[in-house]
């Protein structure tokens, strides 16, 4: 069964996160629900920043953004770990 996973980041600032994603040529949307089409219960997760229907970032209780995605159905051509590295590097340049 497929489900959303979360990965902690060190990203704390939403405007810089959005700018980093846009500089990496991603189409950014804010305040969206991710929907897992392969989950029979149609799991939904609210995220603050998304770059598609199944990849996003949400602010956790510690004030840090975490990557939210279904790793099993990852569609981006860049693998998840490399994607997060690229976003983090671009964010650090802000």
Features from the language model and the residues they span:
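Interaction-mediating elements
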Residues: 1-94
């Amino acid at each position: 069964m497929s489900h959303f996973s979360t990965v902690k980041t060190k990203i704390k600032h939403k405007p810089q996160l959005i700018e980093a994603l846009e500089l990496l040529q991603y189409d950014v949307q804010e305040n969206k629900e991710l929907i897992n089409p392969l989950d029979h219960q149609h799991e939904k997760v609210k995220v603050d920043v998304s770059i598609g229907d199944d990849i996003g970032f949400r602010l956790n209780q510690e004030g840090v953004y975490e990557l939210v995605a279904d790793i099993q159905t990852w569609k981006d051509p860049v693998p998840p770990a490399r994607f997060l590295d690229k976003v983090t590097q671009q964010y650090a340049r802000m």
